[in-house]
Amino acid sequence: MKTTRSESLFAEAQSLFPGGVNSPVRAFRAVGGTPRFIARGEGALIFDVDGNRYIDYVLSWGPLIAGHTHPDVVAAIAEQAARGTSFGAPTELESELARLIIQAMPAVEMVRFVSSGTEAAMSALRLARAATRRDKVIKFAGCYHGHFDGFLVQAGSGVATLGLPDSPGVTAATAAGTLTAPYNDLDAVEALLKANPGEVAAIAVEPVAGNMGLVLPQPGFLAGLRRLADEHGALLIFDEVMTGFRVAYGGAQGRYGITPDLTCLGKVIGGGLPAAAYGGRRELMELIAPAGPVYQAGTLSGNPLAMAAGIATLRIIGAPGVFERLEQATAALCAGFERAAADADIPLRAAYAGSMWGFFFTGDPVVDYASAKKADTRRYARFFHAMLERGVYLAPAQFEAAFVSLAHSDALIQETIAAAADALRSL
């Protein structure tokens, strides 16, 4: 596979950007080799600057549930761009997208748009602290809520990939306000609440963990968090930046039937453009300025291009049968990977929720960050490159989720499974 153009561009990029990239995982540090520079996308496919074609399971890290360059999304962006790209003033598009979100998620009675998942999580925590008049937050080891200082403790995603326990620059005082528990461990959460009586403002969780690889919530875990939050006067924050409109149209809260106090959204709601949001009960959201005293603002919040792309995307995936088709494709993919691994006598466990999926090279159950870290990351790196050579683009790190789009046809799913079988035999 020819990669000379990507190699040349990456060499130049390293003189322009820290590590040659604008988000760490893109640098291929966890798997080695040269990042592919992408020239264009079409449906479920991406093409790099050297002309190589790949079936894409990264999908811009989740937003592109309709696939690359879906004609409805492209048309919506083009039509809005012709009218204006940004106004810094209210638009009807903001209200239209907000209504779609509120209709899909009963826990969200009001919403505030921001431009990134980090902003959404940061703002939701500030609101929770103001509402409860408490300072501490419980998060879960390996869960990632953006690069805000208060959540950058035992974080997942690129932090996990780079093996950083925490980030330099986060003050000890800030870190002290962030309590961590193992994912899926209700006893640990209860112990933290009892050890910090009246001090915990919120429990923040990825309802399906997607930043330590994909780890599913154990039966009763999310319901247990709801119960513990209620018993101890804390708010429950679902970070659905990844799971919202991805594991079900109504997100993880709809899939599992749990009602959080606050919800963070991103990725899918922007249709591939920078958009995120946080929302919740009316009495909480009315504490946000200018209705209330909790300040939050943003120059590009509710940007009309992103709103247009988000509306088009939610209309596409809101059609009958969409999530059934997505889940069937994802289930087939996971079953195919496990079958291919078994045939190659290689331990592999795959899991999925909706159109979000992942796998670990291990024979043991993966229920939290500690068990995820026991998986064979060196084998993952070899498998990643073997798949890349066979035209399949997976996440360049073990500790990331993968995604399926509406553009992933049965033929592409079977092509991927065949590539995986061949790649596994080569390891």
Curated annotation (Swiss-Prot):
Cofactor(s) required, per the database record: pyridoxal 5'-phosphate
Coiled-coil regions listed in the entry: none
Pathway: Porphyrin-containing compound metabolism; protoporphyrin-IX biosynthesis; 5-aminolevulinate from L-glutamyl-tRNA(Glu): step 2/2; Porphyrin-containing compound metabolism; chlorophyll biosynthesis
Broad class of enzyme this protein falls into: isomerase
Keyword Isomerase: yes
CDD domains per UniProt: OAT_like
EC number, as in UniProt: 5.4.3.8
Pfam families with a match to the protein in the record: Aminotran_3
Gene3D superfamilies, sorted: Aspartate Aminotransferase, domain 1, Type I PLP-dependent aspartate aminotransferase-like (Major domain)
Keywords recorded for this protein, A-Z: Chlorophyll biosynthesis, Cytoplasm, Isomerase, Porphyrin biosynthesis, Pyridoxal phosphate
GO cellular component: cytoplasm
Modified residues (N6-(pyridoxal phosphate)lysine): K267
Subunit: Homodimer.
Family stated for the protein in its record: Belongs to the class-III pyridoxal-phosphate-dependent aminotransferase family. HemL subfamily.
PANTHER family cross-referenced by the UniProt entry: GLUTAMATE-1-SEMIALDEHYDE 2,1-AMINOMUTASE, GLUTAMATE-1-SEMIALDEHYDE 2,1-AMINOMUTASE 1, CHLOROPLASTIC-RELATED
Protein name, as recorded: Glutamate-1-semialdehyde 2,1-aminomutase
UniProt organism field: Roseiflexus sp. (strain RS-1)
